[in-house]
Every structure is written in structure tokens, then in C-alpha cells.
């Protein structure tokens, strides 16, 4: 009886009830007993075959009720049906509660789905310019699941709405149910009456007894026999003795053997038989043994069934009794009608059906026990379908066991009989089932399923093995991969994958459910194994998950190791790098690193894929416009919107052996070193003026974490104009360095936090004992003592190119060697040498020391360091300027300024060659001036001013005598000489007459050792210039003896300096005649053309 939903008003009696008025009869009150027994029959008892059955109320009460109803004339009241009714409010409460429970389950299910983080800056935009939001597969699946839940619950509540509207008319439907129940009860009463009458008639037949045969009974009683019964003359057989029994058995055996050998057509399946004990036993392997015998010797007579035994297990036993009798009858009928062939066919089909039923029963037992919810079995006619891994989505797999028929011929000939066949559908496709262990002699569904599942798992793991082994990491033997497969036990099938040098993964498939089981050693992060696509096949899922786990393990291992070396992990979002477009598509995991020692525009990236793990060097645009500290927060905020370059530098993330502290330190050293080398190679390639090898694309970290060296082709003449050093005027560029320069990395200076770069090269000219001139504490330059090799040490942050400094140092080295070569040619001894200065000794005994300094202007950083700007820049970036310095005891210190100026003047006579000649030429003069300084006999009246015009031109001024003399160098008969002449004081008469007369007499018209007068001057050899000055001093002393101090005071009050200045001083004079400032020995014409000087001159005051 279907249930009825009543609204609350009708249930509680607030509306019109069914008992208010039914069939025109007023119903009983709500509290009457009729509601307590709604199903009972109250219209009287039901008579059957004229017999009235009393009910619980008694016949008298029923009779009185009938009489009352008949007296009233109203029909009896219909039974009111309330069984199965329940209120609508209960249904609504249950539905609301169920909706709440389902919603809670949905929330928990959606929480388990991991949605990757979403960056709003990279959200896709629809054609209508609306942001689509996160469109990842996980997020879409969550939305679809929520939509399906809402749609389902909406349908349920629509049904509740329809029921609530229908329940308002439930009273009429309830009345109809009562009428239907009454009609059905009447039909049942009619049917019961007919059935009772039929049963009675059948029972009466058995009760009939035939009339007794009194005559035969009397004859038997009187005579003990019946004469009327015929006598057939049968005699009982004689009892058999053992001998006769044996004889008959042997006779039957001969008859059966003869018959089978000569007359009967024995089917192929019955070819194996034996005759014994008066019977023949046909043996069908794996099925049954059939015992038959004969009833007579006629060869055309049939065989008779004796016994049958099943040869497979488990096999049912045939119980004695009805079943055995029916089997006996059926076999004998088959033997009589069809012979042995038909008997075999019938028994064979019986056995096949029996085997299928046994397998079906085993499958049913398995599905209710160990294989619950994972095995489904269904018997269709004589085909058993076994679906394993039933809870697994996507494609299905099952086994079909049925009777195989077909025109397959046997090995002997003829058609093969039907047999049990196995059909294997693996992942929706039929495959060969020959390897499945299907033993029809020993039936076992469990063993069959295990064999099929083992083969299925072996297929999955072998396919995954084949696909993983095609990856480069496993094909070249970098990582190991082993598969253990079996055909019988699925739990023994497994795939061992080496993830990294220290981590391994075991892949297996749970035999019952088909779920993939991954076990990592040590345990890998579970969060990386969350992306499980249900639409993928199992093989694709295994390969994908193994790839993700391997790459995640590799990157995790690298991150944990390199962070101990001070590396900082950088998020690609902070540097605005689109890693998916930067790296190949097969890269599954990546991580960016930076170090606080490096330049901000360089990053290292570690990528991992199934084809290999690689280190990348990534160059981002310079962040000059952004102020960045070298702190953790600032280090990850690179101002880069794109990647300038990215290149693979190593195919190994960590050392091949088990990493320890030393190998990790080597890794950090190698990465920083390679970055330093690569930055220089990138700079040179962008410069496009200098060849390098190996080429930038072939630059890799060598075996054993060896930092490669960079070979540079160096030619100063082929450098861009900006990088060619501007040498001092008159300095000729000469090549001393061979073309090939090798740039190598030599570690990190931990104090300065810079990379140590060393450039190795060879000199084209061998200089003996040159290496001894470099100081041991000078680390910027090393010269080989026994060869031509040299090394330059450069410092810079890893990632900052040292190319500009290297090229400048090489040109500086050539400049220093050029100076050294000139000094050696001039017979001067070099005492020490560096890239910025060169010390040498000169003089007759090499007792005087001098130092040549090489200075330059510094480039403007950082814009000047851009290789593209340097390549097209006009003008030199570096300008060299030579200077010379002397120690305090060197007499040439007095003309140090003019000598330095003479080194850098753009004239033909200027230069280092001229400087060395000037040093030798002026040395006697400077020594003579030093003697003047050291003369203790000088007094106030013998002050002399010596003004240095240039290195070869001097003015001697005697303030008290108002006399000015000029001492210049001249060429006389191709020999350099000193010429002493008067300057203006003789012509204008300002000079003291007595002093003038003395000069004319003792110098101009006289001669001495190494000097002689010219009438208007004196010429002296360079080595005897001291003798001339001594004679001049004596001339002055003799003049002073004839003059008074007072007159001397009056004469010197206007032009003499203060008398209290007793020490030599250098001060400028403005009204003196300019001397020729050209370096070297000037000729007479050049000396006469010299004009007044526009620069300050030095005055040497000697007292």
C-alpha cells in the first residue's frame, strides 16, 4: 500500500476528516476504538464453503451488528486506511536536515581540493573586458561541484512544493484509497473461496476407495494361490561363485574391448579409456571419468551408465537419491539415442556449466568479503563477467569466462569441442589473455584475478618504466630505474625510481582497488602530489606524478643545501619574470637564487625536469633607477620587467656524490665564480670588438664543479676608441703583450666581499730579472721570473664585469714596459716596478733614485660601463699622465715640476728619452746648486736667486748687485753645453759697474777647466758647469770685499728680499723673461724666439 502524505490540518482533525462522513454514514468520534484497529475487517466474518469462521468478537456480537445495520438500512462503514501515512512537516524536516548534511559534506569535499594561488595581475580577460578570475582546473571543478549540488537540491525542493500543493486535497485521495481497499478485499475473498473449493475437490479424490474383490480374496484365503493368474515359468538364477564371477567379468571385458576396437565410433575426447571389472572408464582430463557397461553382447546394443567422477576441483559430490537417479536416466537416454558422442557432448556441456557456476559462486563470496566494493560479478546465461577495480573511474577492466565455440581444429583432426574461454578487457580494450593463469582443472577466481591484475599492473608499470626510461636522466644512467614484475602475485610488482642522489621512490599499485601507491625514501613533501587528474590514464598519471615528485625533490634538496651557503631564494613574482616562457616546456620545477655578494642584475635559476636538472644564469635589466639595499627584502625586489639573457651553465644541480660540507662549499664557490666569468663574457659579446672562446653559448661549468676560464683575444689597436688609453704626448704605443689573455676566477675575498679575478698572459719580449722588480706585497701584478708570463689581479663583485679594468691594466702594463725598456736602453737601473709607478737609479754610481708615476682619469660610472655605449662612444675613457718624483736628497728635486711638465708636452722634443738625457745633462748643475746650499760661509750680502724656467733654462739673480744672468742649454758642435749670459742688466746699466767689470774680466774674457768666455757670455761643458758657478761665486765674493754694507743696503732696499730669510725658498716671479719650456736641448733659434712666460716660475733662493 503506497504511503500518503497528509497536511497538518487533516492529520490533527482541524479539517474535514474521512470519518466525518463516509458513504453517508457518520463516523465514530476521534477517540473511538476504530482508529486503533484500522486494518481489521468489521463487516462480518467471511464464510468459506458454507462454514462460518468466528472472529475475535464472537458470533453473537457480529450477528447483532448485522441486524442493526440491516435494520437501519445503511450500507456498512468502509474500513479507513491510515497505515503508511505520515505528516508533511516530517518530510520537510527530514529534507531540510538531509540538505544540511549534504551541504556540510560538500564543504568538506571542496576543502580537500587544493586550488593553486592566483595572481590578479595575470588574470585572463574575456572579450568583453571582464576579468575571468582563477580558471585553474581545480577551481573549475569546485565550481561545477557546487553547481551540481545546488541543481540537485533545487529539484528536490520543487518536488516538495508539488507535494505541499497536492496534500491540500489528500482527504479525497484517502477516501479513494478506502474504496480501493474494499474492492481489493472483495476480490481476495472471491479468489479464496474458489481456491478452497478446488482444494476440497482434489482431496476428495484421494479419499475414494475401490470396491473390494471378494472372490479373489476368498480364493487366496482358501487355497493360498490364485488360479487365474498366469505363470511365466521364470526361474531364479543360480548364485555366482567367485570363479564364475571372474569368468563373466573377463568375458564382459573382452566383449567391451572388441566392441570399442572394431565397432563403436569413439569420440576424440573418449580416446583415453581403460576396460576393467566389466566396465569401461572413459577419462576426459580436467573434466570427468565415466564408467559404462553393456547389457548384452550385441554390438548394436547401448552402453549403460555405471558411475561418474569429476576430475576438477573444487567439484561437487553427487548425492545418492533422486539426483543420481535422474542423472542415470538422462545419461542412459543419451547413450540410447546418440551413443558415445552425444553422451560426451551432454556431459561436457554439463561440466562447463558446472565450472562456470562454481566460479560465479566463488566470485560472489569474494565480492562479499575481501573484495567488497572493488569486485563486481554478473552471470549472464553461461558467461561470467568479473569486473575488477570497480571503484576506479575512467575506463573499466573485466574478465569474461564463457563457453568458447568455433571452427578451431584439434591437433588430431576434426572440430574441437566447446571449452571454457577467457576474454580479457583491459582498460576498455580487449587484449590477449594467454598469459593469464586460468586453470580449468583447479578452479579459483582469486588466483585468476590475481594473475590478471598482476599482468595488468605489470603492463602499467612496464609502460611507465618504458616512458620514464626514455627521459634523458634515466637513459644516460644518471639516475637508476628498476622494475620488478611478476605474472602471479600483484603485490610483488613495483617500480623503483631514483629521484635524486639521496632520495628514492617506490611505485606500486594496490591490487584490490587499483590505486597508485607512492612511497618515497625519505618521505617527500605531500603537497607536491596533489594534482591528480581523474581524466588521465593510470600510466600517464604515474609518469606525471613521478615527474613532479622527482623535480620537487631535486629543487627541495637544492634549496635546503644552497641556503646554507648564503643563497637567498627569490620569488619570480618579485622580479617579474615569466618563468614558463623563459624555460623550456618540459621544466616542471624551478627556483631562483641570489647572493648578497652579487650584482643585483644577476640571478641563478635551478630548473628540474625529467630530462635533466640544470643551473641557469639569468640577467635582468639594471636596477640603477631604483635604490636597493643589499638586504633580504631589497634583494628580492629587482627592478626588472624582462629578462635580458638566460643560459644553461650546468647540467647538475648538486655534486654527483653524496654532498657534504666541502662539496657544498665547492658548489657555492663554483656558482659565484661562474657568474663572475659569465658576466665578463656577456660584456665582451655585447661589446662586439673582442673575440672570446669558448663562445658564450658554450660556456659551461666543467667536471668536478670546475669554473671555466675565459680566453680573450687582446689587441690594443682593435679596441673601441673609448677603451683605448690616451697615452702622454710623444709617447709611442708599443705592443708587449701577446694576443691571448686567459681570465680565471680565484675565489671570493671574504673581507671585501668581492670576486678575485686573475688575468694570465705572456709578454712578446723577454726581460731578464723583470719579475724581481715587483714587490712581494703588490698583489695586482705578478711577473714570471724565468719566463714571459704575467698575471693581473682584479677585484669586482660577482656579476660585475672587469673587462674595462682588465683592458686598462693591460695597456698600463705595456706603458710601464715601454718606460722600462727606455730606461734600460739609457743604462738606468730599474729598482722596482708596478702598474702605476717605476723606480730607477741613475747617476755615475747609480746613487740617485727617481720614480715615474702613471696616473689616469677615472671613467664616469655606471653609464660609461654600458658595453653598447662604450662601443659607440667617441673619445678616450682613460687619459694617462706621467709624473716624476725624487727623494729629498736628490738634487733633481728642484726641477721636478718642469721635468714632469716636459713629460706630457705635445712636442717633438718632449718625452721619456729626452727626460733621461736631461737628467744626465743637468746632474752636475744640480749638484753644484746643492753645494751652494751647503756652503756655510755665505752671509746676508751674498744672496743669490736662481729661477728655474724649465729643466734646461735658469736665471741667476744677484739682488745686491742688480745683476741677472741666464744659464741655458745649447748645442755647440753637436754637443750639449751650458751658456751663461747677462740678461738686460748689462744693456740698461742697472748692474753694478764693478761687478760688471769683474764678470767681463774673470768670466767673459777668460777661460777655465771645462769652460771659456765668449766675450758676451760663457760656455761650459756639462760636467764642468760647477767650476763655472764656483768662479762666478768667487767673482761675487771679490766684488763684495770692496763695497760697504751701507751702500749695499741702499742698493738692495728696492729689489732684495728680506734679509731674515736665511733658508732656501721657492716662490713665483712675474716679471722675468720666459724661457723655452720645451723638453730636451733646444737650439739657439728656438731659444731666441721664446716669449714671455704666462705661468708661474720657481725661484730658488740660495744664501
UniProtKB/Swiss-Prot annotation:
Any Gene Ontology biological process: regulation of transcription by RNA polymerase II
Compositionally biased spans, kind Polar residues: 23-36
Pfam families (UniProt xref): Med14
Compartments (UniProt record): Nucleus
Cellular component GO terms held in the UniProt record: core mediator complex; mediator complex
GO molecular function: transcription coregulator activity
UniProt entry keywords in alphabetical sequence: Activator, Nucleus, Transcription, Transcription regulation
Chain segments carrying region Disordered: 22-61, 1043-1067
Disulphide-bonded residues: none
Domain of life (superkingdom): Eukaryota
Primary role: Component of the Mediator complex, a coactivator involved in the regulated transcription of nearly all RNA polymerase II-dependent genes. Mediator functions as a bridge to convey information from gene-specific regulatory proteins to the basal RNA polymerase II transcription machinery. Mediator is recruited to promoters by direct interactions with regulatory proteins and serves as a scaffold for the assembly of a functional preinitiation complex with RNA polymerase II and the general transcription factors.
Listed PANTHER family: MEDIATOR COMPLEX SUBUNIT (PTHR12809), MEDIATOR OF RNA POLYMERASE II TRANSCRIPTION SUBUNIT 14 (PTHR12809:SF2)
Subunit text: Component of the Mediator complex.
Entry similarity comment: Belongs to the Mediator complex subunit 14 family.
Name of this protein: Mediator of RNA polymerase II transcription subunit 14
Lineage, broadest ranks: Eukaryota, Fungi, Dikarya, Ascomycota, Pezizomycotina
Name of encoding gene: rgr1
Amino acid at each position: 500500500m503506497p504511503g500518503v502524505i497528509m497536511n497538518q490540518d487533516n492529520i490533527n482533525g482541524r479539517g474535514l476528516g474521512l470519518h466525518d462522513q463516509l458513504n453517508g454514514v457518520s463516523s465514530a468520534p476521534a477517540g473511538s476504538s476504530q482508529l486503533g484497529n484500522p486494518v481489521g475487517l468489521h463487516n462480518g466474518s467471511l464464510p468459506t464453503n458454507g462454514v462460518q469462521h468466528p472472529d475475535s468478537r464472537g458470533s453473537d456480537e457480529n450477528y447483532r451488528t448485522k441486524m442493526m445495520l440491516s435494520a437501519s438500512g445503511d450500507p456498512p462503514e468502509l474500513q479507513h486506511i491510515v497505515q503508511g501515512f505520515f505528516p508533511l512537516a516530517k518530510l520537510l524536516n527530514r529534507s531540510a536536515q538531509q540538505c544540511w548534511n549534504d551541504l556540510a559534506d560538500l564543504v568538506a569535499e571542496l576543502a580537500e581540493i587544493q586550488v593553486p594561488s592566483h595572481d590578479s595581475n595575470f588574470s585572463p580577460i574575456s572579450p568583453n573586458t571582464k576579468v575571468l578570475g582563477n580558471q585553474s582546473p581545480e577551481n573549475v571543478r569546485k565550481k561545477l561541484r557546487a553547481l551540481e549540488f545546488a541543481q540537485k537540491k533545487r529539484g528536490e525542493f520543487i518536488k516538495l512544493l508539488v507535494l505541499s500543493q497536492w496534500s491540500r486535497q489528500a482527504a479525497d485521495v484517502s477516501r479513494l484509497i478506502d474504496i480501493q481497499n474494499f474492492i481489493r478485499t472483495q476480490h481476495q475473498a472471491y479468489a479464496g473461496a474458489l481456491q478452497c473449493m478446488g482444494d476440497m475437490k482434489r482431496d476428495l479424490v484421494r479419499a475414494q476407495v475401490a470396491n473390494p474383490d471378494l472372490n479373489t480374496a476368498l480364493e487366496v484365503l482358501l487355497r493360498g494361490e490364485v488360479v487365474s493368474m498366469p505363470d511365466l515359468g521364470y526361474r531364479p538364477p543360480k548364485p555366482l561363485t567367485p570363479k564364475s564371477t571372474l569368468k563373466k567379468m573377463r568375458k564382459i571385458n573382452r566383449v567391451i574391448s572388441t566392441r570399442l576396437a572394431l565397432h563403436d565410433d569413439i569420440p576424440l575426447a573418449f580416446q583415453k579409456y581403460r576396460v576393467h571389472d566389466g566396465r569401461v572408464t572413459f577419462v576426459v582430463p580436467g573434466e570427468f571419468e565415466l564408467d559404462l557397461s553393456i547389457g548384452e553382447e550385441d554390438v548394436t546394443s547401448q552402453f549403460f551408465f555405471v558411475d561418474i567422477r569429476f576430475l576438477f576441483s573444487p567439484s561437487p559430490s553427487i548425492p545418492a537419491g533422486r539426483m543420481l537417479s535422474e542423472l542415470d536416466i538422462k545419461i542412459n537416454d543419451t547413450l540410447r539415442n546418440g551413443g558415445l558422442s552425444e553422451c560426451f557432448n551432454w556431459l561436457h556441456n554439463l561440466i562447463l556449466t558446472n565450472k562456470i557456476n562454481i566460479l560465479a559462486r566463488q566470485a560472489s563470496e569474494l565480492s562479499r568479503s575481501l573484495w567488497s566494493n572493488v569486485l563486481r560479478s554478473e552471470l549472464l546465461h553461461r558467461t561470467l563477467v568479473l569486473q575488477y577495480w570497480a571503484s576506479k573511474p575512467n575506463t573499466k577492466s573485466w574478465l569474461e569466462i564463457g563457453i568458447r565455440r568455433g571452427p578451431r581444429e584439434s591437433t588430431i583432426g576434426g572440430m574441437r569441442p566447446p571449452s571454457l574461454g577467457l576474454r580479457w578487457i583491459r582498460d576498455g580494450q580487449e587484449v590477449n589473455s594467454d598469459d593469464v593463469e586460468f586453470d580449468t582443472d583447479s578452479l579459483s577466481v582469486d588466483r585468476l584475478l590475481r594473475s590478471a591484475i598482476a599482468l595488468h599492473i605489470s603492463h602499467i608499470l612496464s609502460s611507465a618504466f618504458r616512458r620514464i626510461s626514455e627521459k634523458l636522466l634515466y637513459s644516460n644512467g644518471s639516475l637508476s630505474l628498476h622494475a620488478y614484475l611478476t605474472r602471479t602475485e600483484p603485490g610483488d610488482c613495483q617500480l623503483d625510481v631514483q629521484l635524486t642522489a639521496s632520495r628514492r621512490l617506490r611505485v606500486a599499485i594496490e591490487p584490490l582497488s587499483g590505486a597508485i601507491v607512492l612511497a618515497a625514501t625519505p618521505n617527500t613533501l605531500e603537497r607536491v602530489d596533489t594534482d591528480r587528474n581523474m581524466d588521465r590514464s593510470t600510466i600517464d598519471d604515474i609518469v606525471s606524478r613521478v615527474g613532479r615528485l622527482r623535480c620537487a625533490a631535486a629543487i627541495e634538496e637544492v634549496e635546503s643545501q644552497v641556503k646554507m651557503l648564503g643563497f637567498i631564494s627569490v620569488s619570480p613574482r618579485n622580479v617579474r619574470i615569466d618563468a614558463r616562457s623563459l624555460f623550456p616546456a618540459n621544466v616542471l620545477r624551478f627556483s631562483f637564487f641570489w647572493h648578497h655578494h652579487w650584482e643585483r642584475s644577476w640571478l641563478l635559476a635551478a630548473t628540474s625536469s625529467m630530462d635533466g636538472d640544470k643551473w641557469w644564469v639569468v640577467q635582468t635589466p639594471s636596477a640603477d633607477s631604483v635604490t636597493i639595499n643589499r638586504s633580504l627584502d631589497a634583494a628580492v625586489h629587482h627592478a626588472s620587467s624582462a629578462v635580458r639573457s638566460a643560459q644553461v651553465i650546468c647540467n647538475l644541480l648538486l655534486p654527483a656524490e653524496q654532498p657534504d660540507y666541502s662539496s657544498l662549499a665547492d658548489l657555492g664557490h663554483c656558482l659565484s665564480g661562474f657568474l663572475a666569468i659569465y658576466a665578463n663574457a656577456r660584456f665582451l659579446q655585447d661589446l662586439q670588438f673582442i673575440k672570446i672562446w669558448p663562445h658564450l653559448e658554450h660556456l659551461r661549468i666543467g667536471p668536478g664543479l670546475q669554473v671555466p676560464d675565459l680566453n680573450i683575444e687582446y689587441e690594443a689597436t682593435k679596441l673601441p676608441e673609448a677603451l683605448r688609453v690616451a697615452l702622454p704626448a710623444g709617447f709611442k704605443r708599443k705592443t708587449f703583450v701577446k694576443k691571448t689573455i686567459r681570465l680565471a676566477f680565484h675565489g671570493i675575498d671574504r673581507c671585501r666581499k668581492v670576486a678575485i679575478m686573475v688575468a694570465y698572459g705572456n709578454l712578446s719580449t723577454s726581460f731578464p730579472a723583470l719579475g724581481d722588480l715587483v714587490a712581494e706585497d703588490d698583489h695586482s701584478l705578478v711577473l714570471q721570473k724565468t719566463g714571459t708570463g704575467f698575471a693581473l689581479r682584479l677585484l669586482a663583485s660577482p656579476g660585475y664585469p672587469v673587462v674595462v679594468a682588465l683592458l686598462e691594466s693591460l695597456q698600463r702594463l705595456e706603458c710601464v714596459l715601454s718606460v722600462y725598456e727606455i730606461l734600460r736602453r739609457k743604462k738606468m737601473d730599474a729598482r722596482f716596478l708596478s702598474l702605476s709607478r717605476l723606480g730607477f737609479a741613475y747617476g755615475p754610481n747609480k746613487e740617485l733614485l727617481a720614480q715615474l708615476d702613471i696616473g689616469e682619469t677615472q671613467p664616469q660610472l655606471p653609464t660609461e660601463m654600458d658595453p653598447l655605449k662604450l662601443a659607440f662612444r667617441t673619445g678616450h675613457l682613460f687619459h694617462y699622465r706621467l709624473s716624476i718624483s725624487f727623494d729629498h736628497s736628490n738634487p733633481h728635486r728642484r726641477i721636478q715640476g718642469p721635468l714632469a711638465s716636459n713629460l706630457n708636452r705635445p712636442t717633438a722634443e718632449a718625452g721619456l728619452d729626452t727626460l733621461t738625457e736631461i737628467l744626465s745633462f743637468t746632474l752636475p748643475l744640480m749638484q753644484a746648486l746643492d753645494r751652494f746650499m751647503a756652503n756655510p760661509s755665505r752671509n746676508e750680502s751674498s744672496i743669490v736667486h736662481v729661477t728655474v724656467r724649465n729643466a734646461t733654462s735658469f736665471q741667476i739673480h744677484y739682488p745686491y748687485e742688480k745683476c741677472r744672468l741666464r744659464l741655458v742649454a745649447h748645442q755647440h758642435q753637436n754637443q750639449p753645453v751650458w751658456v751663461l749670459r747677462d740678461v738686460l742688466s748689462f744693456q740698461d746699466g742697472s748692474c753694478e759697474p764693478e761687478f760688471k767689470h769683474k764678470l767681463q774680466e774673470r768670466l767673459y774674457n777668460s777661460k777655465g777647466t771645462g769652460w771659456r768666455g765668449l766675450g758676451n757670455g760663457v760656455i761650459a761643458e756639462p760636467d764642468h758647469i760647477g767650476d763655472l758657478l764656483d768662479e762666478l761665486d768667487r767673482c761675487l765674493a771679490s766684488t763684495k770685499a770692496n763695497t760697504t754694507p751701507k751702500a749695499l743696503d741702499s742698493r738692495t732696499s728696492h729689489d732684495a728680499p728680506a734679509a731674515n730669510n736665511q733658508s732656501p725658498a721657492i716662490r713665483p716671479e712675474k716679471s722675468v723673461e720666459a724661457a723655452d719650456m720645451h723638453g730636451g736641448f733646444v737650439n739657439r733659434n728656438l731659444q731666441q724666439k721664446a716669449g714671455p712666460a704666462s705661468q708661474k716660475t720657481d725661484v730658488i733662493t740660495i744664501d
